[in-house]
Every structure is written in C-alpha cells, then in structure tokens.
C-alpha cells in the first residue's frame, strides 16, 4: 500500500508550504494607514485570503479521509515458478501479459525480502541499473506533478517487480509494433495504463498515467539495449531482485526485438501479421486429428479425454486450501479450448493494435474484463460441482 496513508499535517505543509500570515499583516497596515477604509473591503480581503488556504485544508482532510480507508482484503501475490534465466519461464507472462512471482527461486527456499520499504528505497535499491531510468516517479509534466500525488509502485518488493516488468513488457511490445509506434502511439500508452490499473488495483494509490509510460519508454528500451549489448548475464540463484530485474529486462528486450509474442508454449507469431482468426486457427489445428481417410474423427474424443484429465486434476485439489482458486486457475491455464482461452485472444488483439474495427480502447478492455469474469464464474461452478461430489 502506498505511503500516502501516513499523510499528516506536517507532510502536507512540507508538500504545499505553510499558510502565510502576510494577509494579517497587510490588514493591520491597512488599518493604520487608511482608517477610513470601508469594512466591506476588509471583509472581502480576509475572506479571500482564508479561502485560499481553506481549499488546501479541504483537500487535505478529504484526501486523508479517503486514503485512511484500508482495503477489506490484503493483496495476494500469485505464486508461480518463474526462473528469469529460463525463457520458458515466461509462458505465464506471454499468455496473460501479467507477471506472477514465486517466493522460491530454483531449488532453494530463500525467501525474498517482503518488508515494507519507502518508495525512495524501492527506487534506489531495485531500479538503478546504470541507465538513466526514472521508473519510480511520476510524469515529467509539471502540471501533473502539481495537481496529483506521485504514482508509486507497490511497496512490496515482489509485487513491485511484477508490476514494473508487466508494464515494460507491454510497452516494449507496442513500441516495436509498426502500427503502434507510427499511427497511434498515444492510444498505446493509454491502453497500457488502463489495463495496468485494472490488474494491479490499489485503493490508496494514484493510477499510473499514459504520460508516465510515454516519458519512461525510451529509458526502458535504452536500458534493455545496453544490457543486451554488454552480454549481461546474471545469476538468479542468489535471489537478488536487482539481478533478476536485469535478466528479465534483457529477456523482454530480446522478445520485443523479435517482434513476436507466444500464446501458450512454443507458439510464436508476428504481431504485425497476426489477428484473432489466426489464433483461433492455430488452436483448432492443434486439437484436430485426421484419420487414414483424411477426415477429422477423434477431435471430440480428444476433448472429452482432456476434460476428464482436467477434472481429475481438479478433484485432487484441497477445497479447504485458501489457494484453491489459484490452483484451479493454474490447471485451467493449460487448456487450449477457445471458451477458456478467449480472454487471452482478446488481449492478443489489443497487443496487435487492431484498432480500426470501430471499437475504442475502453470497449476492448471491457471485453477483456467480461471474459475474465466469465472464466471466474466457470471456476465458481466447478467448485460447487466438486462440493456436491464430495458430499455424495
């Protein structure tokens, strides 16, 4: 959670400055020098000077009141085995476009430091890798800096790393897409910002802005390019977040340079020449089996066997486990059926920037949300079915 919950009067005065008492002094001088001044002018002056500071008071009281409301449930980190030195570990990122992090690295049980740090600690400890990056601040736009609080990454180091890599991954992909970089770059940054704010939602944190992504995109590309040219190789076994961040940045840069995105395992495709039709065809081809006469005969049987296998995997899960839903999601993520993978296809359309079909960015994001919600409903029904089976 953002450090803004500790926002007090002192920090408010440090940020906005103390209320000046010059209006009172000016009023006394006016009384001495001009005794015959009308009382209406005095009242008008005092009201004007106080209202200016009162507005700041109202802002402080209202914003601290909102910020002090704690979320009902703590934010959980989805645990997933990701070894940044292994390209296959990026399957989860490449299929959902969000990074989930695992506390265990390789075979060691080294727990990463998840203590709460200040935003400045995060900026200095994790992100300074030699390139002139500014990943921990807000936009360079002065108007935004004056009017809004600064955007902060999560204070949880694990979650913070996931957030940064997710945004960099999206930004690099869209930056290397011809349609994104030449035709509608502003929409690209806005799309990343809106999707990020939906996935990593925190009540007391200022949403990330498209301006912030735009201002830092060049630095991210430069950072990955420099590390790539140096032949930088890190050791992920140490559990050092800085090294993992460097490894991941190189991997993301190489993936973006190739201009490809993998949906599932070992299914690369070019963004510029790929749409939803080719994705659906790829899934259909992977499930289709032909017999000696050249007819598709066993597709239904394969689907039935696969569903039975998935069902058996889910039945082995512990219903009382608090991570039951996450474990079910891991099982379902391996299914290639269109009804369960539809949300991946929709997100892929966003990445390929197919913006000319009359749909706006918001409408496409709404489609993503609806599909994800539908998947969650399916999981709920599966759990109810399992409860019924166990009771029998």
UniProtKB/Swiss-Prot annotation:
Keywords: Cytoplasm, Nucleus, Phosphoprotein. GO terms for biological process: nucleobase-containing compound metabolic process. Residues 21-31 have a biased composition (Basic and acidic residues). Residues 18-52, 284-303 are annotated as: Disordered. GO terms for cellular component: cytoplasm; nucleus. The modification Phosphoserine is found at residues 11, 139. Residues 287-296 have a biased composition (Polar residues). Present with 538 molecules/cell in log phase SD medium. This is Protein SRL2. The lineage of its organism: Eukaryota, Fungi, Dikarya, Ascomycota, Saccharomycotina.
């Amino acid at each position: 959670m953002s450090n803004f919950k500790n926002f007090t009067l002192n920090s408010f005065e440090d940020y906005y400055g103390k209320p000046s008492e010059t209006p009172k002094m000016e009023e006394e001088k006016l009384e001495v020098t001009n005794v015959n001044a009308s009382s209406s002018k005095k009242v008008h002056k005092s009201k004007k000077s106080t209202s200016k500071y009162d507005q700041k008071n109202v802002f402080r009281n209202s914003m601290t009141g909102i910020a002090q409301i704690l979320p009902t449930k703590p934010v959980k980190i989805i645990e997933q085995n990701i070894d940044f030195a292994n390209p296959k570990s990026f399957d989860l990122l490449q299929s959902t476009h969000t990074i989930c992090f695992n506390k265990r690295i390789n075979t060691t049980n080294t727990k990463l430091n998840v203590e709460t740090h200040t935003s400045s600690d995060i900026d200095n400890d994790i992100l300074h890798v030699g390139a002139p990056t500014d990943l921990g601040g807000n936009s360079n736009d002065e108007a935004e800096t004056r009017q809004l609080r600064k955007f902060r990454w999560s204070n949880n180091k694990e979650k913070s790393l996931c957030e940064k890599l997710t945004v960099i991954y999206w930004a690099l992909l869209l930056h290397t897409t011809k349609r994104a970089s030449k035709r509608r770059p502003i929409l690209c940054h806005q799309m990343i910002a809106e999707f990020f704010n939906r996935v990593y939602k925190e009540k007391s944190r200022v949403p990330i802005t498209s301006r912030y992504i735009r201002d830092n995109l060049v630095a991210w590309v430069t950072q990955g390019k420099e590390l790539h040219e140096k032949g930088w190789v890190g050791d992920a076994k140490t559990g050092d977040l800085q090294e993992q961040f460097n490894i991941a940045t190189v991997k993301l840069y190489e993936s973006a340079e190739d201009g490809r995105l993998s949906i599932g395992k070992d299914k690369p495709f070019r963004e510029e020449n790929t749409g939803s039709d080719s994705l659906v065809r790829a899934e259909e081809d992977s499930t289709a089996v032909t017999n000696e006469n050249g007819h598709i005969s066993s597709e239904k049987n394969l689907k039935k066997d696969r569903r039975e296998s998935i069902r058996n995997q889910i039945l082995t899960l512990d219903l009382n486990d608090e991570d039951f839903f996450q474990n079910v999601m891991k099982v379902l993520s391996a299914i290639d059926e269109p009804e369960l993978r539809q949300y991946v296809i929709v997100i892929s359309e966003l990445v390929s920037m197919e913006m000319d079909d009359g749909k706006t960015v918001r409408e496409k994001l709404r489609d993503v949300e609806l599909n994800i919600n539908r998947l969650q409903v399916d999981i709920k029904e599966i759990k109810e079915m399992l409860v019924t089976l166990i009771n029998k």
